[in-house]
């Protein structure tokens, strides 16, 4: 399954990267993801909510939250969020299941 983690760099991390602008965080991220049996798919820098990173990785759904927790526990990032990414086929299957389930539900007001 695919997951996406987004996070903002802390002032401490930005200061460290300013002192060593050639630093490569991808290697550290890849090591963490592969230690959990996953695969790093992509890593991007982000600027929308301040300097940060977006990591897309493949992992077992029981392990992905642990990977996010390790990242969140570092003092280099804040505002860590993880999402499960769904393919178009998965979204269509969810919509179909919703239609089936809707037939068996009636809101309390009815």
Where are these regions (language model features)?
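Short connector loops at helix/strand junctions that flank enzyme active sites
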Residues: 49-52, 77
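Short S/T/G/P-rich N-terminal loop/turn motif that feeds into the first structured element of a domain
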Residues: 1-34, 39-41, 46-50, 62-65, ...
């Amino acid at each position: 399954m695919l997951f996406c983690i987004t996070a903002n760099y802390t002032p401490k991390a930005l200061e460290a990267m300013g002192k060593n602008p050639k630093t490569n965080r991808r290697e550290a991220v890849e090591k963490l993801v592969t230690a959990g049996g996953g695969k790093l798919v992509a890593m991007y820098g982000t600027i929308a909510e301040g300097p940060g990173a977006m990591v897309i990785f493949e992992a077992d759904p029981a392990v992905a939250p642990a990977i996010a927790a390790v990242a969140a526990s570092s003092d280099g990032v804040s505002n860590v969020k993880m999402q499960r990414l769904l393919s178009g086929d998965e979204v269509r299957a969810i919509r179909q299941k919703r239609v089936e389930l809707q037939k068996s539900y009636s809101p309390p007001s009815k």
